[in-house]
Amino acid sequence: YGAAIENGPGTQEQIWHRDQPDYALLKAGPGTAEAMLNFFTALTDFTPDTGMTQYIWGSHKRVELGEPDAEHPVVFTKLKAGDTAVLSGKIVHRGSANATPDVFRRALALMIIPAIMTPFDATCHLSRHMVETMTPLAQKMVGRRSVVIPPPHTVGAALGIWCLNMREVGEQMGLKSNQPDKEEE
């Protein structure tokens, strides 16, 4: 999935986080599978004033988010517009504050995740009536609801994956759930 990121003047520094959520199937930390790669492209220059992405060196080998220390120092990326950083979803990082009065910091993040996190086949053949008899969890499993990562693994607004207009896809479609199957009555 992808996201356009815009940090305006006065944007605060983010909290330390990983882009790879803590899925029950794919955990973060050493000796675990890579579950996400982020192709992070700067659309504007990332400077000390507009804010640079900070990484905790070696954090992909730790289970906990942790804080920077002597063995895991902070590394800043000073990207120019058009530069792309490719990083593991396990890397602990954050965006720095934008201290400028009038400059926006913009980026494009394209995340690659394994196909095991999505339905194998398209489910467009399932009627809306049938989908509305399902629970919200079942609707997620057939791609008719957004998958939202629960706290504490979210950063800011919990937008999720597979959204419509940056909102939960089922709500945007007016999708109901747990409806009786009228055909069986």
Curated annotation (Swiss-Prot):
Its EC number is 1.14.11.-. This is Dioxygenase easH. Dioxygenase; part of the gene cluster that mediates the biosynthesis of fungal ergot alkaloid ergovaline, the predominant ergopeptine product in E.festucae var. lolii. DmaW catalyzes the first step of ergot alkaloid biosynthesis by condensing dimethylallyl diphosphate (DMAP) and tryptophan to form 4-dimethylallyl-L-tryptophan. The second step is catalyzed by the methyltransferase easF that methylates 4-dimethylallyl-L-tryptophan in the presence of S-adenosyl-L-methionine, resulting in the formation of 4-dimethylallyl-L-abrine. Pfam families: PhyH. Induction: Strongly expressed in planta but weakly expressed in axenic culture. Keywords: Alkaloid metabolism, Dioxygenase, Iron, Metal-binding, Oxidoreductase. Homodimer. Fe cation binds at H17, D19, H93. It comes from the Eukaryota. One of its GO terms (molecular function) is metal ion binding. The gene is easH. It comes from Epichloe festucae var. lolii. Belongs to the PhyH family.
